[in-house]
């Protein structure tokens, strides 16, 4: 007891008028009452703290020892720990601090004997151990504090949206995902080969290993209120925010100038978060102007108030069960199976049912049963309602049951009106002008072997609009109509995935019978008259060779006196024939660093070629070689724009080349093609008379 009093001497805990455990400050003229554990000598008055203002109450953390050896292990005593705790409290948020103080008082309430003025916790039955901490971040708290916390800490109110069973199931999934992350990090294939880890690939691979898929939700920063954007991200005005979720559990949010950048940033933060000690919590998050409960992953011991606003509506987060694939069902019991809408965006019946169930937010399940004749029976359940069944092997029975279920659902579907496609290609002519263009003036522009691309390029070349209109037929068959300037050109019937291609092909064939066709042969075969790198560099060499040495040059006179009569240097004339050209060095680089720039093309040479073409009357486009780099093609684009020319790159990778040409009107190009038959890589094919 004497050791404890010596350690507690001079500790000031401040004023706490709102708690009964701490005595209020005595009025003037009255002596301060001593507690029962103060002894005979009153504590000495201690000078003010050198650090910062203390909070109104702070728990006292001390180290008690029963021997001199234990005292020698901590030579600085409790003063050092008191300073560390003051720094810890200063950096804690206010809400965490209030919870901290409430837990500390709960600990005091759970013990029968303590010193009310000094704040020490004293027990009779259990000895005081060394290094006792009340911080929740300590990995090994004392048994007494654990019991006190379990008795006095109020349990959080249960969530009405997410039951405890759902939270426990999500916690198990996150633990499984965390173990998968650590396993992949130890895999040399994931980290070797490049200095930077592909976090998006790693997270997707780990989540798919847990038999589910990640969910990415994007939102433009312009649609997010400035107050909801982090302070360090307010410089981004045209960027995107990406929220990463998995099984409806919020992981992280990333911000960047593009969608892919925000996704990569969010996945990087998610992988780093999953490497820590984490847990699944139910917190209230802001969505636009409302608040709702959400499942989040946060680090153990950290507060949950720093989460950014949600990008997914709260009504889409209600989880009440799982489907056959393990995916969550969103408010599934509220819908009846007769309201099921089929979205035929797959080739087989199983894919159509699964995609339609995800679209309708309903549950679909396949149940198998072994029959006495060693065959399997598969039954399809939609919203716990048995639709159909199939027999055969385990694989064929599922397909048979899905086919029967799809036929039953198609009979219950309402009669849908014609569904217009959203593809509409418009030229630069104003649509609101009210002038309807005649199909007789149309010119087919063929730039690709794909009929859909040809039809879209034709509409853009003639400044017309093209639409694709779908109509549901019987079964899985659809009818697609091609409408050009409100006039039906062609139609086709087939599967929805391929019917558009077939209808566009019929439309192109119909138009070619009556309309002229302009064929762009640029992408077909090798391109002639290509400007190579050596040809561009040759212009600089020609200018250098123009610097001929005159007869009165001192070097020339010395060579003449030594017997040089012209040509190459040396006894047999095997040396250089032309004098060394003077090369300008504009930057502050040394001569040794100029080796890498030998093959670079000068900008003035490119500009000279394009300037000569712009001033000429040539109608043939300039085609630059595939040898040019991206930076060199970028310079050509800039120079072509400067002289009012159009430029476009074609090809992919090493086969990419650039074409510079004049801006031509459709009428001018047709007139030239009618006169000459072929202009550059353009060719005119007139319709053949029947």
Curated annotation (Swiss-Prot):
Residues 600-664 form the R3H domain. A motif (Nuclear localization signal) lies at residues 25-45. Enhances the ATPase activity of DHX15 by acting like a brace that tethers mobile sections of DHX15 together, stabilizing a functional conformation with high RNA affinity of DHX15. Involved in the constitutive silencing of the interferon beta promoter, independently of the virus-induced signals, and in the inhibition of the basal and cytokine-induced iNOS promoter activity. Also involved in the regulation of IL-8 transcription. It comes from the Eukaryota. Interacts with NF-kappa-B. Interacts with XRN2. Interacts (via G-patch domain) with DHX15; promoting the RNA helicase activity of DHX15. CDD domains: R3H_NRF. Widely and constitutively expressed. Expressed at lower level in colon, peripheral blood lymphocytes, lung and kidney. Coiled coil: none annotated. Keywords: DNA-binding, Isopeptide bond, Nucleus, Phosphoprotein, Repressor, Transcription, Transcription regulation, Ubl conjugation. It is found in: Nucleus, Nucleolus. Residues 551-596 form the G-patch domain. Disulfide bonds: none annotated. It comes from Homo sapiens. This is NF-kappa-B-repressing factor. Changing residue 569 to E: Abolished interaction with DHX15. PANTHER family: NF-KAPPA-B-REPRESSING FACTOR, NF-KAPPA-B-REPRESSING FACTOR-RELATED. The gene is NKRF.
